């Protein structure tokens, strides 16, 4: 590549990172947190571990909660979220029950604050569009970064953490970018398509069918095809249906049971889920039974859709790390997805640190560290407040974030301010994880493991910063 063209790519990479880097880190951190959003909600409520109750028992309990309704939607429990949700319609779920104890569970927790931050920056649908645009920015950074460093693949294993903070940040930036490149591309493209695709669908619906825009979504979902009635069994109850469903449809994983007109002869039962080997969500894979007794009358299968529709369907599960459709590999891929998200945060933060360390006393450098360190520190305080804080968690998050910004602006040494932030976060994550791990007998242990990993990352940064502040030689300052 010509030197002039490579220099232009390098300048574009630095400019895009400088302008959008802080927002990108905030969204990536919130996204990584969101991967464990459901587990963190249970973590906050200190729910015990144990074997889940039979699915038929949980379903009967759920239907009994809203027995007077014309329609009931029951979201079935999963390994990641052992809770059964009873809804009047999707999004309106007044009853949540633990799949282990059958006891009520709170529908929300303060740990949902960073999740909302990632989804829409607390700005509703316009915020969702802004978040999607950062996916475009990340794509630009990934392309320009690959062009700049494409001849340095041999350096992907190098991490000089004992030779100064700048070299450590530089190597960390290269290492995370090269090792996690496929996942970063996945995050960028699916993140951009997630919001922009929804916006495009909404605009199309207003133009094509302004009187009934929901019809566009119905067309995307596809129509039910009639099954071959020969050999299909009939069921006297929903419980019997769910018990025999795995044997009858071994590749179908149920996630939602919808009942219309329960208790009547014209009742309709729709079981939504995913199929093994097909990336999708519950609204695109459905089986429908009608009447008394229940007879299979419709099958909706995304495999019958066109290639572009199937790509649209796959965006959400790929972006949120929902790998249920890959059966046995799902836990490992979900863990890898989280690690890639964690690496994406390190990638962005190390790139911003390189810029901030070039002018540590400038206002922009201090704001960068404060705005990026703020949400991490605020989440640490959120986790600690689950045990002994009398403060309102929704007020704690923005307050701690703002205090962190002022702290980095006013503290004499920026590197020492960052060192203190890293130490507090590391100690807070370790304390919260260990206390929960031992007090709840291992429930949500994978959440505690993720918190300990985050603490290790903060501690490593603290060690490097401590060496920088301790060392006065020219070698350590470079």
Predicted regions and their residues:
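Conserved histidines in hydrophobic membrane contexts and catalytic metal-binding motifs
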Residues: 1-478
């Amino acid at each position: 590549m010509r030197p002039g063209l490579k220099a232009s790519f390098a300048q574009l990479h630095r400019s895009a990172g400088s302008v959008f880097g802080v927002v990108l880190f905030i969204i990536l951190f919130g996204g990584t947190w969101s991967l464990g959003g459901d587990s963190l909600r249970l973590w906050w409520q200190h729910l015990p571990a144990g074997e889940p109750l039979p699915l038929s028992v949980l379903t009967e309990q759920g239907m009994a909660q809203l027995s007077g309704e014309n329609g009931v939607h029951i979201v079935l429990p999963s390994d990641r979220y052992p809770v059964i949700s009873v809804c009047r319609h999707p999004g309106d779920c007044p009853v949540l029950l633990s799949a282990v104890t059958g006891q009520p569970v709170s529908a929300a927790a303060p740990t949902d604050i960073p999740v909302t931050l990632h989804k829409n920056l607390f700005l509703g649908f316009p915020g969702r569009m802004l978040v999607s645009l950062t996916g475009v920015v990340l794509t630009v950074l990934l392309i320009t970064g690959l062009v700049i460093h494409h001849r340095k693949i041999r350096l992907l294993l190098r991490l000089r953490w004992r030779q100064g903070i700048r070299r450590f940040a530089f190597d960390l930036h290269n290492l995370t970018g090269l090792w996690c490149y496929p996942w970063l591309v996945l995050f960028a493209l699916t993140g951009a398509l997630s919001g922009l695709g929804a916006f495009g669908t909404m605009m199309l619906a207003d133009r094509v069918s302004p009187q009934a825009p929901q019809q566009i979504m119905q067309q995307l979902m596809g129509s039910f095809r009639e099954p071959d009635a020969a050999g299909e069994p009939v069921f006297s109850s929903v419980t019997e249906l769910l018990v025999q469903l795995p044997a009858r449809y071994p590749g179908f994983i149920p996630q939602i049971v919808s009942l219309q007109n329960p208790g009547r002869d014209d009742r309709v039962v729709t079981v939504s889920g995913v199929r093994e080997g097909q990336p999708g969500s519950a609204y695109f894979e459905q089986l429908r039974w009608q009447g008394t007794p229940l007879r299979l009358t419709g099958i909706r299968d995304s495999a019958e859709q066109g290639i572009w529709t199937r790509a649209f369907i796959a965006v959400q599960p790929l972006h949120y790390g929902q790998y249920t459709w890959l059966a046995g590999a799902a836990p490992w891929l979900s863990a890898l997805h989280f690690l890639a998200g964690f690496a994406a945060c390190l990638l962005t933060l190390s790139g911003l640190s390189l810029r901030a360390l070039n002018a540590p006393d400038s206002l922009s450098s201090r704001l960068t560290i404060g705005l990026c360190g703020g949400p991490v520190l605020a989440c640490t305080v959120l986790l600690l407040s689950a045990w002994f804080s009398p403060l309102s968690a929704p007020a704690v998050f923005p307050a701690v974030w703002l205090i962190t910004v002022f702290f980095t602006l006013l503290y004499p040494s920026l590197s020492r301010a960052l060192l203190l932030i890293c130490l507090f976060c590391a100690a807070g994550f370790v304390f919260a994880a260990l206390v929960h791990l031992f007090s709840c007998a291992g429930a949500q242990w994978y959440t505690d493991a993720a918190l300990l990993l985050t603490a290790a990352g903060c501690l490593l940064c603290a060690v490097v910063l401590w060496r920088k502040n301790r060392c006065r030689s020219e070698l350590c300052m470079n």
